[in-house]
Amino acid sequence: MKLLENKVAIVTGATRGIGKSIAEMFADQGATVIFTYVSSEDKAKLLESELLSKGVKAKGYKFNVADFEPCEGMVNDVVKEFGSVDVVVNNAGITRDTLLMRMSEEQWDEVINTNLKSVFNMTKAVQRTMLKQRSGSIINMSSVVGVKGNAGQANYAASKAGILGFTKSIALELGSRNIRCNAIAPVFIETEMTGALDEEMVQSWRDAIPLKRGGQPEDVANLALFLASDMSAYITGQTLNVDGGMLT
């Protein structure tokens, strides 16, 4: 039996990078995969086709998870169509990096709303269903930047640190109903976005990591799969770093 067979999973921000890798891995392990996106329709259609080709059910929803009502509406639709929500991966996120002296209110609000408010929105939306089921796994994508901070990323660091406190609080609130909530804190993950950066700078980041390489989206997806599955049934309220030993 596959690790996520008969489970319904929602992954936000899933058409590229870490989110895409998680959606693909969940499908490989038998999950029905529901995903959200805000940008490319073409990428979403390709992902949906790819997931369906794995022999599972899949569906994409286009909306901004920073908006509360669409999150509720989507979860209601998913429960009606697929019967449950067993796993949520709050992965959607953006950066608007700049020093505090140059940061606009808009840049602050945009990052906080997309990265942190969306986690509240989706968790609130699935709470009722998971409480009725007396089961569920909520996985929140934080960052090593949320653990240690980073110059030029005050907005991003605040949003990712907020996720850590939210995760612990939800684990305490919902644990008695067998609903688990954990956070993943990746460091330098090599994706399409990092591929556009200066290679010399990227190599300097790799050199600063004890394992001497950047992480791959699959490294994060492997942990998300573990946290989504029953293998992690006694793990909740934790922040698990995927950092190649950087914070050691």
What are these regions (language model features)?
Residues 179, 214-242, 246-247:
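C-terminal substrate-recognition "lid" of short-chain dehydrogenase/reductases
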Residues 123, 159, 167:
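Active-site helix of classical SDR
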Residues 8, 15-17:
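Conserved glycine-rich cofactor-binding loop
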Residues 29-46:
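Conserved glycine-rich Rossmann-like NAD(P)H-binding loop of the short-chain dehydrogenase/reductase
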